[in-house]
Amino acid sequence: MIRTFEMELGGRPFVVELGKVAELAQGSCMIKYGDTFVLVTACASKEPKEGLDFFPLSCDYEEKLYAVGKIPGGFIKRESRPSEKATLTARLIDRPIRPLFPKGYHNDVQVIATVLSVDQDCPPDISAMIGSSIALSVSNIPFMGPTASVSVGMIDGEYIVNPTSEQKELSELELIVSGTKDAVMMIEAGANELTEAQILDAIMFAHEEIKKIVTFIEHIVSEVGKPKSEVIVKETDSELLAEVVSFLDTKLANAIKTVDKTERNENIKAISAEALDYFEEKYEGRSKEVNTILSKQIKVETRKMITSEGIRPDNRKLDEIRPISSEVGILPRTHGTGLFTRGETQVLTVTTLGDLRDAQRIDGLGEEDEKRYMHHYNFPPYSVGETRFMRGPSRREIGHGALVERALKPMIPCKEDFPYAIRLVSEVLACNGSSSQASVCGSTLSLMDAGVPIKGMVAGIAMGLIKEEGQIAILSDIQGMEDALGDMDLKVAGTENGITALQMDIKIAGIDRNIMETALAQAKIGRTHILNKMKEAITSPRTELSAYAPQVTKLKVHPDKVREVIGAGGKVINKIIDETGVKINIENDGTIYIAAPDQESARVALEMIELIVKDPVVGEVYTGKVIKIMDFGAFVEILPGKEGLVHISNLAHERVAKVADVLAEGDLIEVKLMEINPQGKIGLSRKALLPKPEKEAPNKVE
């Protein structure tokens, strides 16, 4: 039976259709938002996976190019690996729903969102996020939702729900918020130096819209929802728990307080091994239970130590930042480098400058575009002292790279002021938490070292939260252990003036406005401290680019002159490129960018183009090249691509019988421009520049 439900979202109808397609999935729905259609399905395995200590959830976002009437490019005419946008959207679907499954539920769960049709003003990512919540909520899968998601923009101080593509161009904020009726679960934001108060107001505005959507989904579930499967989770043996806690005594707490990460892990590992050996001997075959209890006790002890004693695993205060060091210019042949170290986290970021043709072409479900500023983040296994196969970038690496890219984007100069493509690569050399925010700092240092005139320095900090038995501890600059065992991961990047990027994931309910307000205020203090430390290495962008960076020169010509610079079949522009070794990029408005390996090549190419676009002037004298001999005269090229005729009568004062008697093809001669007729044809004279012969005196008759 087909059921249709409708509400208004962002001033447009949002329609949910159930019971028509994908009926064999445990949960499915078709989302129709304007002309955007997204099919979302949810399925779970019948039995849990044995031996897992995590929840095996996978979320996929499939971009079908037929949704925008395109055929995939290349030799293989079908969609292949997900685009960066698809990967980021899959992460947006995953993050708010993952905490809402029962603890101990280890069945495989897969959510697939397939984009079937795209209306650029009705975002398919938001449709997919809401659709995933609906598909899970109406299924028998034990999902403790529903959740909902909205996008928020800000124009002239006013917040807009799900802004259109035109509104996004004007917006100072790009915010996506997911949550339940009671709490915000996930935030992803990019902003143009907005204040903490503006960001917080936008989040609260989004949550009010989320509440309306959740109420709408609850109505759908009440009408068509299936009974939820029962989750049987084995309870911890209270007697065994008490024995393990007694055995650990204060040893575990002391091990957790070890400052050095590697030493701390070794100490915890040694105590755990000792406990496992002891209880295996005492209760044979119960090692798995003991191991589960040990993992829980590590979390309990760490959280209790932070909330009750105000002590963190490395003995820092709650708002204390780890020691920071910054360096620039450490790689001699690169265009710019920044090495940022914070505690045991270290990131090297390298800047590479290229000409505008190096910009990345974006050809997905959105309108065709190109990206001249890119950031890529790499997290090799050695950064955490581990081994693993190194293949392509993981979803996490793509997500972190996009976050750092968003943090720096408002500071990147426009193409007109800095006509370069910019690629940043952050290599995580060592990691004990906050590597993405260390990449923000390293990227700022690297850009400044490269001489990119950024509008301001950007720093990033990761904040954490522990909420235990009514006690709340907000942590600045969290390390890996605090991230894993905490209740919130809040990453904030910005300048001294405001926030440029924000990402938040919350694992528990009950994070209210006051907590977020306190966390953002504490993050600002930490961010300012980090910026001051970064200034010890470099305070402003270098005034000169690296000697190894391309030299880009900009020239503006009348649009009508563009065809003259290009020439028939590209003849003129290819000649310039061949003779000078430069790269040339021409835009429709007449802006020409010349990228050269050195300043001399740039100068020569610039002069050649200036000559091409220069208009011939009547009365001017030119040195031209004879390009063709005719019976009636010679054609002479006076400027690149511009030629005129020297009529045989204008070659010399005396009578010339044959043009070839005076000139040959390839000769360089001086000519004067005598006229340009209404058809644009140029008349030249060689004779006008030659001295007139003296008249012979008449013979005297005796």
From Swiss-Prot:
It holds the Pfam family KH_1. Residues 619-687 form the S1 motif domain. Its cofactor is Mg(2+). InterPro entries: ExoRNase_PH_dom1, ExoRNase_PH_dom2, ExoRNase_PH_dom2_sf, KH_dom, KH_dom_type_1, KH_dom_type_1_sf, NA-bd_OB-fold, PNPase. GO terms for cellular component: cytosol. CDD domains: KH-I_PNPase (cd02393), RNase_PH_PNPase_1 (cd11363), RNase_PH_PNPase_2 (cd11364), S1_PNPase (cd04472). Involved in mRNA degradation. Catalyzes the phosphorolysis of single-stranded polyribonucleotides processively in the 3'- to 5'-direction. This is Polyribonucleotide nucleotidyltransferase 1. It comes from Alkaliphilus metalliredigens (strain QYMF).
